[in-house]
C-alpha cells in the first residue's frame, strides 16, 4: 500500500518582483486577494534574485535561467555572462582552442567566418561585448570574410534601442578593415523556443541564403525602415544587408558559424535547424557543410563543439531528492518548462529517478498580451490533480505569466496576467490544505512591477533587479532577513527534515517555532 504524501510545493511566479513605487506597477495595481491574504497571515519576506547574489555582475538584472539554476542548485552559481567576460578581460578568450580552430578552418578553406547572436547589452542571452571580442578575434587571426548576423533584442532592453549597437558595429568593422553586418532580424524569429518553426525558418533563410523580406545597404537604414513599419527591435522582419556591390552574404560549404548566445533555451531551435541532418521543423532549401560552434552547451543532444563547457553541478535539489528516495513533480507551460527541468537540474536534460514532468502547451498567440492568462487554468488543473493524488513529496511549478506578459510592455494585460496567477494560487493553496501540505511562493526575478521606463518613456519590457517575494504557507515560523534564491533548496530540505548536502552553500532561512 502506497503511503499518502504530504507535499511541499514550490510556486515560482516568473517575473514577479517587489517595487514600492505604484507608478506603472502592474503587480501593485492588480487585484490579488489571495496573495494579499497569504502575506497577512503567513511568514513572508523579500529575497534577492539579481547581481552578485545569483552569480551575475553587480547590478545585473536576474533572469529565468539564472534564477532557476540558483534555486535548484542551492548555491550561488557563477553565470556564463561573468565567465565569458572574465575570459575576455584576462586574454583567455583569444586563446580558446575551439574558437581558434573554427576560425582557422574557415580560413584554410577560403571560407567565411559567420558570427550570429543577440546583439544587445542586456546580458540575459548574450552580450554585445562578447560579440565584439569574437569579431576582433576573427579579423586578428586573418579572416578576410567576417559576417555578423545580428538578432535584435527590445525585450531585455528598451523596445527601440538597437540603433546604437548597430552603429557601433558598423564603425567597428570600418576600424578593423574587414567584416560587415550581413543581416538583421528580431529575436521573435531567430530565438523562438515554442516550436513556431514558421518564425525560425525566416531566420534560417536569412542566414544561410541571404534571403530576407527586405534588403538594405546599411543596417541602421534597415532598422529605421523597420521602425517606420511600426516594428520594434524584437519584431524586426528579416532584412539582408548588401555589400558595396549589392551582394548578400550566404552560408557556404567550408564556412564557419559561431553562435554567441550563452543562454541555451532560445538558442536550441535555430541551432537544430542548422546542424541536424534529420531536422523536420520546416523545409530547408540549403544545408551547407559548415563548421558550427556554440559559445556554451545548449543541450545534451546538440552535437556541436562548444567554446565553454558547462561546470557539473552535483547534489542539486532534484538529485538530492532522488538520493533520498523522494518523488517530485516539475510542471509549467512550454515557455518555462525548460526552466523547471533542465535549468533547475543544473543543466541536466534527463529527469532524476522519481521525477515526473508535465508540460502544458502555451497558447498559440502572436504575443501573450493577447491572452494574458495564458494556459494557467489548465496548468492549475493538472497541478491540483497532482497534489490531491498524494503521489509527490515535492512539487515545483512555474507560472510564466508575469514575465511573458511583462515582456510585451502592455500594462493592462500585465495586470490581468497577475490577477489570473493570483486566482490559481488560491486553488493550489486550497488543494495543499486538503492533504496537509505546505507551500513556498517566490519568483525568479522581477518584471511586471515596472512596465514603463522612467527615463525614456518607452514601455519597460526588460527584467528588473528588484527583490522578489518569499512566502511560507505552512507551520508557525519566522523568516530570516537577507535571503537569496540559493537559500530556497536548503530551506525546502530543512522543512522536510532532511540533511542539506555540503555542496549547497545556501542556508535555511525559515525558523520553525516549537
Swiss-Prot record:
Chain residues that bind Mn(2+) 1: 403, 407, 463
Pathway(s) served: Carbohydrate degradation; glycolysis; pyruvate from D-glyceraldehyde 3-phosphate: step 3/5
Keywords annotated in UniProt: Glycolysis, Isomerase, Manganese, Metal-binding
Catalytic site positions: 64 (phosphoserine intermediate)
Residues binding Mn(2+) 2, per UniProt: 14, 64, 444-445
Biological process, per Gene Ontology: glucose catabolic process; glycolytic process
SUPFAM superfamilies: 2,3-Bisphosphoglycerate-independent phosphoglycerate mutase, substrate-binding domain, Alkaline phosphatase-like
Cofactor note: Binds 2 manganese ions per subunit.
Record's keyword annotation contains Metal-binding: yes
Pfam families: iPGM_N, Metalloenzyme
InterPro entries: Alkaline_phosphatase_core_sf (IPR017850), BPG-indep_PGM_N (IPR011258), Metalloenzyme (IPR006124), PGAM_B_sf (IPR036646), Pgm_bpd_ind (IPR005995)
Cofactors, names only: Mn(2+)
EC number(s) per entry: 5.4.2.12
NCBIfam families: pgm_bpd_ind, PRK05434.1-5
The protein, known as: 2,3-bisphosphoglycerate-independent phosphoglycerate mutase
Organism: Shewanella denitrificans (strain OS217 / ATCC BAA-1090 / DSM 15013)
Gene: gpmI
Amino acid at each position: 500500500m502506497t503511503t499518502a504524501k504530504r507535499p511541499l510545493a514550490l510556486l515560482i511566479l516568473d517575473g514577479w518582483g517587489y517595487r514600492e513605487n505604484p507608478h506603472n506597477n502592474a503587480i501593485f495595481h492588480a487585484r490579488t486577494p489571495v496573495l494579499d491574504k497569504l502575506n497577512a497571515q503567513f511568514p513572508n519576506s523579500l529575497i534577492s534574485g539579481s547581481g552578485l547574489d545569483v552569480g551575475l555582475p553587480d547590478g545585473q538584472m536576474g533572469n529565468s535561467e539564472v534564477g532557476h539554476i540558483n534555486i535548484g542548485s542551492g548555491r550561488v552559481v557563477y553565470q556564463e555572462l561573468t565567465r565569458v567576460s572574465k575570459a575576455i578581460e584576462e586574454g583567455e578568450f583569444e586563446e580558446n582552442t575551439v574558437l581558434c580552430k573554427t576560425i582557422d578552418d574557415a580560413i584554410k578553406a577560403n571560407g567565411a567566418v559567420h558570427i550570429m547572436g543577440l546583439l544587445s547589452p542586456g546580458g540575459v542571452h548574450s552580450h554585445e561585448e562578447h560579440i565584439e571580442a569574437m569579431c576582433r578575434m576573427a579579423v586578428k587571426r586573418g579572416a578576410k570574410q567576417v559576417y555578423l548576423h545580428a538578432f535584435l533584442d527590445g525585450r531585455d532592453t528598451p523596445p527601440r534601442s538597437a540603433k546604437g549597437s548597430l552603429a557601433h558595429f558598423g564603425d567597428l568593422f570600418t576600424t578593423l578593415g574587414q567584416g560587415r553586418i550581413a543581416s538583421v532580424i528580431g529575436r521573435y524569429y531567430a530565438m523562438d523556443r515554442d516550436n513556431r518553426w514558421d518564425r525560425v525558418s525566416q531566420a534560417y533563410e536569412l542566414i544561410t541564403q541571404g534571403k530576407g523580406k527586405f534588403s538594405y545597404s546599411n543596417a541602421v537604414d534597415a532598422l529605421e525602415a523597420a521602425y517606420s513599419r511600426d516594428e520594434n527591435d524584437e519584431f524586426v522582419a528579416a532584412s539582408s544587408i548588401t555589400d558595396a556591390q549589392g551582394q548578400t552574404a550566404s552560408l557556404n560549404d567550408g564556412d564557419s558559424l559561431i553562435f554567441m548566445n550563452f543562454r541555451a533555451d532560445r538558442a536550441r531551435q535555430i541551432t537544430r535547424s542548422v546542424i541536424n541532418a534529420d531536422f523536420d521543423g520546416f523545409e530547408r532549401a540549403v544545408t551547407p557543410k559548415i563548421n558550427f560552434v556554440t559559445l556554451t552547451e545548449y543541450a545534451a543532444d546538440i552535437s556541436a563543439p562548444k567554446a565553454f563547457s558547462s561546470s557539473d553541478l552535483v547534489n542539486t535539489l532534484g538529485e538530492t531528492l532522488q538520493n533520498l528516495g523522494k518523488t517530485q513533480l516539475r510542471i509549467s507551460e512550454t515557455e518555462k518548462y525548460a526552466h523547471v527541468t533542465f535549468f533547475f537540474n543544473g543543466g541536466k536534460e534527463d529527469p532524476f529517478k522519481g521525477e515526473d514532468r508535465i508540460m502544458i502547451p502555451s497558447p498559440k498567440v502572436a504575443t501573450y498580451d493577447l491572452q494574458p492568462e495564458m494556459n494557467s487554468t489548465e496548468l492549475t488543473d493538472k497541478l491540483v490533480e497532482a497534489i490531491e493524488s498524494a503521489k509527490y513529496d515535492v512539487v515545483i511549478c512555474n507560472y510564466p505569466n508575469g514575465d511573458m506578459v511583462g515582456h510585451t510592455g502592455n500594462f493592462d494585460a500585465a495586470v490581468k496576467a497577475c490577477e489570473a496567477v493570483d486566482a490559481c494560487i488560491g486553488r493550489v493553496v486550497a488543494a495543499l490544505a486538503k492533504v496537509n501540505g505546505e507551500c513556498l511562493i517566490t519568483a525568479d526575478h522581477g518584471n511586471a512591477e515596472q512596465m514603463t521606463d522612467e527615463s525614456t518613456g518607452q514601455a519597460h519590457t526588460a527584467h528588473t533587479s528588484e527583490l522578489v517575494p518569499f512566502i511560507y504557507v505552512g507551520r508557525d515560523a519566522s523568516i530570516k532577513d537577507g535571503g537569496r534564491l540559493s537559500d530556497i533548496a536548503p530551506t525546502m530540505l530543512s522543512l522536510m527534515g532532511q540533511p542539506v548536502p555540503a555542496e549547497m552553500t545556501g542556508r535555511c532561512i525559515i525558523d520553525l517555532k516549537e
